[in-house]
């Protein structure tokens, strides 16, 4: 297991309330964007341009690609745009979990942006998928997100 993976226990998890909502970043390749559209879940995209920003004031799960060189090299794994978004305290406070994408060619650092963010924010790392994802990934993530929100809504009744 990579050193950036941290086990988050149930007592640490603040489950989301409301309806499923995804905040995501996608580079100009649009791989993550195309994947998110398949989920058919309400979403908002973190802008590619660093001089633009968004604010979020409701529970969400973050979906991000991974940028890194493989092996133990994880410098730059989390896109700068995602870091900027999470540096906003309010945006960060509503993050309830993270999902990452990556390329299995990078071995141990496949999807490592997810565990890095999970560890930093103490939120669960929910799933990782490769590049554009598969229909199985779409089904799994939809199931995970709806169950995650259902649990949160039930706990707060």
UniProtKB/Swiss-Prot annotation:
Which GO terms fall under molecular function for this chain's record? FMN binding
List this protein's GO terms for biological process: protein modification process
Instruction: Write out the similarity annotation.
Output: Belongs to the NrdI family.
Write down the NCBIfam families for this protein, in alphabetical order. nrdI
Record's function text? Probably involved in ribonucleotide reductase function.
Q: Protein name, please?
A: Protein NrdI
The uppermost taxa in this organism's lineage are:
Bacteria, Bacillati, Mycoplasmatota, Mollicutes, Mycoplasmataceae
């Amino acid at each position: 297991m990579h050193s950036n993976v941290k086990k988050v226990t149930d007592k640490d998890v603040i489950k989301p309330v409301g309806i499923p909502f995804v905040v995501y970043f996608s580079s100009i390749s649009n791989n993550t964007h195309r994947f998110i559209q398949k989920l058919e879940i309400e979403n908002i995209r973190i802008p590619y341009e660093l001089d633009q920003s968004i604010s979020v004031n409701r529970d969400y799960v973050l979906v991000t690609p991974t940028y890194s060189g493989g092996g133990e090299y994880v410098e730059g794994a989390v896109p700068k745009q995602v870091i900027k978004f999470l540096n906003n305290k309010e945006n960060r406070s509503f993050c309830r979990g993270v999902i990452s994408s990556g390329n299995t060619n990078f071995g141990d650092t496949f999807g490592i942006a997810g565990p890095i963010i999970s560890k930093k924010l103490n939120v669960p790392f929910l799933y990782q998928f490769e590049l554009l994802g598969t229909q199985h990934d779409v089904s799994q993530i939809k199931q995970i997100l709806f169950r995650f929100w259902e649990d949160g809504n039930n706990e707060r009744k």
